[in-house]
Amino acid sequence: MAKKGNRIQVILECTEHKTSGVPGTSRYITTKNKKNTPDRLEIKKFNPILKRVTVHKEIK
C-alpha cells in the first residue's frame, strides 16, 4: 500500500481585508510540505479587491 504524502493543500486568506469593511474575501490555494513547515504559512500576495499586496495567512 502506498504511503501518504507530506504535501497538503492549504487555503490562504487576506488578514487586512476583514478590517477594511469592503465586501468579499481574497483567498489563494497552495500546497505546503507539513514536515518542513509545521506551523501556519504567512505569505504576501496580491489582493485584487484592495488592489495592493497584503499578508495572507493559512486558515483551517
Curated annotation (Swiss-Prot):
GO molecular function: structural constituent of ribosome
InterPro entries: Ribosomal_bL33 (IPR001705), Ribosomal_bL33_sf (IPR038584), Ribosomal_zn-bd (IPR011332)
Pfam families found in the cross-reference section: Ribosomal_L33
Tree of life domain: Bacteria
GO BP field: translation
Keywords from the UniProt entry: Ribonucleoprotein, Ribosomal protein
GO CC annotations on file: cytoplasm; ribonucleoprotein complex; ribosome
Family, similarity comment: Belongs to the bacterial ribosomal protein bL33 family.
NCBIfam families: PRK00504.1, PRK00595.1, rpmG_bact
HAMAP family linked to this entry: Ribosomal_bL33 (MF_00294)
UniProt protein name: Large ribosomal subunit protein bL33
Species this protein is from: Flavobacterium johnsoniae (strain ATCC 17061 / DSM 2064 / JCM 8514 / BCRC 14874 / CCUG 350202 / NBRC 14942 / NCIMB 11054 / UW101) (Cytophaga johnsonae)
Gene that produces this protein: rpmG
